[in-house]
Amino acid sequence: MEKVVGIGGMFFRAQDPDRLARWYHERLGIDPVPTDYGKTCWTQAAGPTVFSPFPDATEYFGDPARTWMINFRVRDLDAMVGQLRAAGEDVQLDAEAYPNGRFARLKDPEGNPIELWEPKDSPPPPATSD
């Protein structure tokens, strides 16, 4: 059986797509969609991707009107949470460390739920030279 090899895109409706794309770029480092096919789009690091339908009545996403939630892998959850909070974002850090890693939650400017995940065996952040 032929199988898909990964997720090629995440498409969703937005009230102000340009503003929302800027927010994702400025806050999370996701490059906007290129304006021509000769340029490269955002490329994610290799790693696990969880694909999981949830029961319709789940409370996991928060607001019941939201039918989806995206989970982004991060290398250093504490650094990402600090960066987002410094930019004025309300981020809820889950105090519990789970067998598969650590998590935090926030919403984008249009109220879409976002989960940040630092996998348990996440590689260390790259060294910086100051």
Summary of predicted features, one role per range:
Residues 29-33, 72-73, 93-96:
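Short linear motifs in intrinsically disordered
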Residues 14-16, 74-77, 109, 120-121:
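Short loop segments at secondary-structure junctions
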Residues 29-66, 106-109, 113-120:
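Conserved short beta-strand elements that form part of the metal-binding/catalytic scaffold
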Residues 9, 48-51, 67-69, 101:
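Structural motif
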Residues 63-84:
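Mid-chain, well-packed structural core segment of small domains
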Residues 1-9, 81-130:
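Vicinal oxygen chelate
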Residues 1-5, 11-50:
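Core segments of cupin and vicinal oxygen chelate
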Residues 11-12, 23-24, 72, 103, ...:
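Aromatic side chains
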